[in-house]
Amino acid sequence: MGSYLNPGSKGFQESLNSEIYVDKTGLIEKTNAVLNTRQKFICVSRPRRFGKSMAADMLAAYYDRGENSASLFSSLKIHYVSSYQQHLNQYDVIKVNMQEFLSMTHSMDEMLTMLQKYLVFDLTDHFQNVRFRDKNNLIQVMKDIYAKTNRSFVILIDEWDCLFREYQQNQDAQKKYLDFLRAWLKDKDYVALAYMTGILPIKKYGSHSALNMFTEYSMTCLLYTSPSPRDLSTS
């Protein structure tokens, strides 16, 4: 288990241990359905405090092949879905919170350098039996891993859009970031699922062409489904 590669289930376990927990594992059925398809790119845009990070923790706990997390899901809705066993703990997971890297750096170049350096550290430490062409190149490292192991990755990016608030007047920094995401994720066999969370829709940033592979789910009208009040009352 690394800091960013196969981070484990601790975050999701804390959600389950909380005084109030609402079962949102139905999301896993949706992500299972798009694994290794052209629809494997998902971006969820919601306001703060709407459970975006909890959902990312949940997906990490479910897919992470580094541990057996079956006991966490045994009483949740996803346990009774046909795809549950097929994908449980079957993927290497990369999970990053972009706000963390933004807070530790002072420029876009520095942020992207640190992000790639830290991910490469976890990857090369874990996959020690792989011969790497270039350990300074994240994309090539992941290509080499996939070529050797035929194991694809679930990539979870929390707060993907935080830099647009920090660099809202710096179009050059924004372009560098979008170009990096596109190069890292698009048309890569090593991606089984890419799941990003943010506050505002992708289109807010004028980035249709850069990230046009993503299907975006945003909240334009907040409503409860009919079972939700009942679920809340029994939580």
Spans of features found by a protein language model:
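Single conserved hydrophobic/aromatic residue that forms the stacking wall/gate
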Residues: 224-235
